[in-house]
Amino acid sequence: MLLRKYDIMKPHYILLTCLLMMAFLDISAQTIPVNKRFGKVSKEELELSSYDLDTSATALVLYENKWTSVHLNAAGAFNKTTKTHTRIKVLKEEGLKWGDFEIVYYSSNNNHESFSGIDVVTYNLDGGKIVETKMPKKYIFDEDFTENYRKLTFSAQDVKVGSVIEVKFDCVDTRYWNLEDIYFQKNIPVNLMECEVRIPEFFSFNKKMSGYHSVDYAAKTESSTLQSSGDSYVYNIDIDYYSAADVPAFKKEPLVYNYRQYYSGVKYDIKSLQIPGALYEDYSVSWEDVDKNYLESDLYIRFKAACQFKDETAAIAAEATDEKKIEAVVKLVQEKVTWDESYAILPEPLGQVVKARSGSNVDMNCLAAGCLRELGFTVEPVMVKLRSTGVLQNYQPELNPFDTFILRVVTSSGDIHYLDCGSSKGYLNVLDPLMLISNARVLRPDGGSEWVDLTRLCVSGTNMYFVAGYDPKGEIIGTLTIRYRGEDAYLAKLDYASYADEDAYMEDLEEDFGVEVVEYSSTGLKDFSDNASEKISFTYSPDTSADLVYVNLFIDPFHSKDTFQSMNRSCPVDFPYPYSISYRYTLQIPEGYAVEQVPENIHITCDELKASVKMVTLADAHTLQAVFTYTQDNILGLPSDYENIRSFWQHLSDIYGSMAVLKKM
């Protein structure tokens, strides 16, 4: 089994008589006054119909309090207790979902979380009187979720627009070192949140703040007494107080893979535990510790397992090139096992995977690794933290920072290929954009692990050629040829596969382009390859006025102003990958017509994105031509650069309205 932080750290049993005194410091003044006691919901809170600081809010956190204490229980073992109290106001229909609660929690043989005191009350006004509806305990459901995890679900009763929902519960966790990240920001506004964290001086934690909204902080200490072996020891409890008022909803913006990493919050990471004369444990880790953790786990054992398909692999050895052999192995694994569309970190026993004919991406990667080693390739796991779970900081080691792993395959000639066998939409060096991170780690024994950048494994782009003619009857009849490569091919395949059939795909294409498709063909959209193409013949009617024909030079825009509607932005812009677009438009001018007007030539750059756009339009008596190119090398735009990026994007999007005018002679 893969060793995790909560399996390595064992509770330490010490005799103790401990008195804990609760206190809280009210630091911030919120816009809406609230009585913080559970059940003390005011008529004013129920009469509230909108939130002045954000009239678009569908719901509002009126008050939230989190109290966390690391302490010793009656048996002398360290535990962590967290008490949560939340009060939410429903302002619009879309906010009704805030009455549904889901808690995924840890439960294994060694360590576990346990919940108690779950109390959920809904408050409504009826004839000017406050009516309370309590949730019966029978509506609390506790079920298996995944390995070592369970899920609690429950829902407030009689929730409607105008309701106030109040919930409280306690959680005791034997993983005392694992303090939950505290977020003062959500995707709805927060009127007031208060938090208290109580930690005995024996513990040392690193604290890291995140986000852009200010959070008030204060600290103090209290004394307590530890009884051990007949001796008494007076020690301090360090108490952190946090308070945040009028916290705006975190606005979801395009081109963000993980919103939570930008929420205003605080994260606690344990460094050490020291009880003088009794115990010292250092919980800080290096990347070498992280490597060792994985190398000594079932992850690496199953990665090194023998080939499961020896006969088929022997036949693959006859392929002409190393690339063809690798490609054949991936196809073999994908024929034998269907991807269950999950990204995992720990492979299942490979025999079970083959028998089930279904598995995670790492199950399939382990099967491919065995075949590739059988063919003489050097194969190594590359540890990846998916972009959807946040950015990995390689200067700040964590024991289990990764979400999954892919394969690094080295050929006899020294060529290096990265691959993931889960998705059939990828290829060698063409991965799901979620995996395109700058800090992936090649896992090697004996201290040989290294960091690698996966953001530029292949050249990605789209080439488009549109050749058409204008029928004097009033229609443009043309053929659009599209060639995708690299990551663009991956996304094109993913898009194509999302439709039930080709007819549904055509119907959507006609709606998007505003055309009538006459003929369609494609290659590579269902293949394991790094390219794909489409050929579409269609007709459409341009706008006309008297003897003028207005020809839009773009069938469909490549970029949109809607991407960056906000005037400012507090989180980075995270593009999927570097890419380019090449588009050539050719229109044959019919006899009796002439080009009256063409757009001006354009060249715009954006230093922040290392991006450039050019458009050149040419015309003679017989042909109208436009050539458009776009290139972008940077994939990350900083908030400080957002104004320039947005301005560039606006000018870029304006290009797609470019019109040429034909005149009947």
Model-derived regions: residue spans:
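Secondary-structure boundary elements
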Residues: 287-356
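Generic detection of long, well-ordered alpha-helical segments
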Residues: 76-77, 303, 319-326, 499, ...
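A carboxyl-terminal module marker
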Residues: 506-665
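Short glycine-aromatic motifs
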Residues: 336-339, 435-440, 592-595
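Bacterial Sec-dependent N-terminal signal peptides
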Residues: 1-33
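Beta-strand-rich, non-transmembrane domain signature
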Residues: 30-292, 348, 363-369, 373, ...
